[in-house]
Curated annotation (Swiss-Prot):
Belongs to the SNF2/RAD54 helicase family. RapA subfamily. ATP binds at residues 177-184. A motif (DEAH box) lies at residues 280-283. InterPro entries: Helicase_ATP-bd, Helicase_C-like, Helicase_RapA, P-loop_NTPase, RapA_C, SNF2-like_sf, SNF2/RAD54-like_C, SNF2_N. GO terms for biological process: regulation of DNA-templated transcription. This is RNA polymerase-associated protein RapA. Transcription regulator that activates transcription by stimulating RNA polymerase (RNAP) recycling in case of stress conditions such as supercoiled DNA or high salt concentrations. Probably acts by releasing the RNAP, when it is trapped or immobilized on tightly supercoiled DNA. Does not activate transcription on linear DNA. Probably not involved in DNA repair. Pfam families: Helicase_C (PF00271), RapA_C (PF12137), SNF2-rel_dom (PF00176), Tudor_1_RapA (PF18339), Tudor_RapA (PF18337). The keyword Membrane does not apply. It comes from Salmonella arizonae (strain ATCC BAA-731 / CDC346-86 / RSK2980).
Amino acid sequence: MPFTLGQRWISDTESELGLGTVVAMDARTVTLLFPSTGENRLYARSDSPVTRVMFNPGDTITSHEGWQLHIDEVKEENGLLAYVGTRLDTEETNVTLREVLLDSKLVFSKPQDRLFAGQIDRMDRFALRYRARKFQSEQYRMPYSGLRGQRTNLIPHQLNIAHDVGRRHAPRVLLADEVGLGKTIEAGMILHQQLLSGAAERVLIIVPETLQHQWLVEMLRRFNLRFALFDDERYTEAQHDAYNPFETEQLVICSLDFARRNKQRLEHLCDAEWDLLVVDEAHHLVWSIDAPSREYMAIEQLAERVPGVLLLTATPEQLGMESHFARLRLLDPNRFHDFAQFVEEQKNYRPVADAVAMLLAGNKLSNDELNRLGDLIGEQDIEPLLQAANSDRDDAQAARQELVSMLMDRHGTSRVLFRNTRNGVKGFPKRELHTVKLPLPTQYQTAIKVSGIMGARKSAEDRARDMLYPEQIYQEFEGDTGTWWNFDPRVEWLMGYLTSHRSQKVLVICAKATTALQLEQVLREREGIRAAVFHEGMSIIERDRAAAWFAEEDTGAQVLLCSEIGSEGRNFQFASNLVMFDLPFNPDLLEQRIGRLDRIGQAHDIQIHVPYLEKTAQSVLVRWYHEGLDAFEHTCPTGRAIYDSAYASLINYLGAPEETDGFDDLITSCREQHEALKAQLEQGRDRLLEIHSNGGEKAQQLAQSIEEQDDDTSLIAFAMNLFDIIGINQDDRGDNLIVLTPSDHMLVPDFPGLPEDGCTITFERDVALSREDAQFITWEHPLIRNGLDLILSGDTGSSTISLLKNKALPVGTLLVELIYVVEAQAPKQLQLNRFLPPTPVRMLLDKNGNNLAAQVEFETFNRQLSAVNRHTGSKLVNAVQQDVHAILQLGETQIEKSARALIDNARREADEKLSGELSRLEALRAVNPNIRDDELAAIDSNRQQVLESLNQASWRLDALRLIVVTHQ
């Protein structure tokens, strides 16, 4: 290589050193000083891994003093270059900048600069970069973006609610599905969409204290959302880091009690500028016109300050009209300000909902019903539609659907309230109860008697709670020497049941963690039964491992022993046998236990086994739950109300189970109350609201589209390629499971989302649902999104050289493959990616400027190419640099037309979509007051900003590949 003192070169292998200067040389070696780091490097002259830095007319360069020069001419004298051009800060022309005075911190970021500086990437990295651009652009455009990445079954009614609400500006809604229909999942899906699209960045979830960990686990396991749990200790710690402790985290969960207990803390919560507030169990917020509770007022304060609010609550019928109004008032106090007016309004909607139910059932409507429908949709001439809907014509069904859609838009609370019932959603299993009456051991009888004498001063409730768990009473007296499991007949029954059903998975739930641990030891030691344990003393990872062991079909645990609290938020649909070793204190907890198996997606009928001891509180509760509430074999929406009204009597019977006088009457009375309340709830069902909430055919199609996306194998191939290039080890474990671990040669030392000890992944939704220790990989998973960011935000794969062996073309023929990106810069919350995500435009140019991209498909072409090592590549580039420059110029002139077409299409689509949505809502505002003024204003403002940002969209060269034809 011809070296001269003062020349500027760049290292091919250590580009981070910046620009080097030749400071010494002899016959065999050359020394380069790299001023930006102060380091020297000694190279062999004959084969040094360095590239001569030469700029061309049109480039802009920086001097060591910081000023910039636009090059007009390049002169060479005695092997040294001088650049002549216009100085940009002073606009002085004909300024000369010698290469020795160039800025040494020079970083080549443009693909063409990297190519000419010898910074040549591997060919597979270029291919990955282009695929990443292509896939990312396609994913942004998907209409159901944000709904595919969660570890859940694809249940239409959940997807419908999440799809509707998740795309709104600052949604304020009430999610009031019946128990078991997945309100938590719906809320998680909405959060996931809002966070992914940038519509929200800061989220606060407020839940009852007992549900904090359940939410933490659900958000992490199902949606890959890492929330921080704030309690007194965490709050105090965070005070050292910030004036407002809640500003130290973006995603926060805390309990309602924690939020309202301290005035300053509540002020900090209100001042923390959340985008979304989620409140679970909102029906426990007590409100009346004269005396709202402190809890209600705390949430009211927050709801006034936070733009988006999701309230998760029991069904409106269970709540009662006043309580239901109180929730709606939190969402929109301007709209729901007068309770009497609200009651009147609701009455007007019932006949309409009934008429629609008849319409959908295919029944003919009376003239009165037709008139009512006509009155409600008064501003349009719908007479022809009504006649078609009420006829036997072929278009009758379509007319009915259109009528229902129009009514839904105008229906009183359908924009703010979503409510699905088990009657309206199919797919639930049957529940079959098997009770096993067992004798009360004498050891327990003695312990109970002594306890009764010693605990005479205890409250009725405490006595009742004690009586539910005789093993605890016995253990208290006997201490560590007490071995209740040696004589308790429930243990013998359980072992017998498990040994006779060895091939079946069984979930055993008991109230206390100690009971679960003792049972595990007995089952293991006596019968060799493989049992996993699951209790609140375990970490989330330990619980995951236990759940995964239970889920394994052949080598896994037969039994999972859960404590009451430990099982919260976990579902085990792959099992259908439930054993309740004891019974919980109230119907809500009973439903929660059965709900671990009774979910949508359960393939078998659920067998509920209740071994109970006679003459104990358990025998009282079994009868009351089953005969009084029918709570074992059916969900019991009336349970809480009847429990509250029968509480005093029930407590007495539980505390003294042998005194049964009047108990039959209590059961009869509770059963009658249950039937009456149930009939009342059924009568109060709002059919129109249910139709709106479950989404009908539209929701089915949405689920089907996502299922088809699940079957697309392109993600698997791309992800494996991505992990290879990042440097992540992959170990295929079979059963559609792969273990990822960090390697020593990764592109970055700590890859975000990959734990130090690695993780197990799967691309199969079914596997992810049964294996909670495996992460479900989709385009929306952080590992994929972080991988895309890592590749696309840097210069990985942005310049490369390949050889094309093709005897039909002359040797030395040049082709340049250019990947341009058309994009618009805007704040994330504008969600510009819906209309113009960063979109790749591929061009394949010969030296005459002919674009062959349409005739030569990327993947086919890529397979025909072979790689060139960096050193040979640098020599090739130097030889054809002028030709490549000329082709680049041709590319710049051709890209404008394609880019402009993309931008114009995006503008047109954005204008049509956003203007259409605005017009629709403005028209409906006249007949449906639930459309908020601030929502309309936000859509209008969003439209203007989106169009303005699209006006300023631009394009840039993102990657290029130089291709040289060879015959060898």
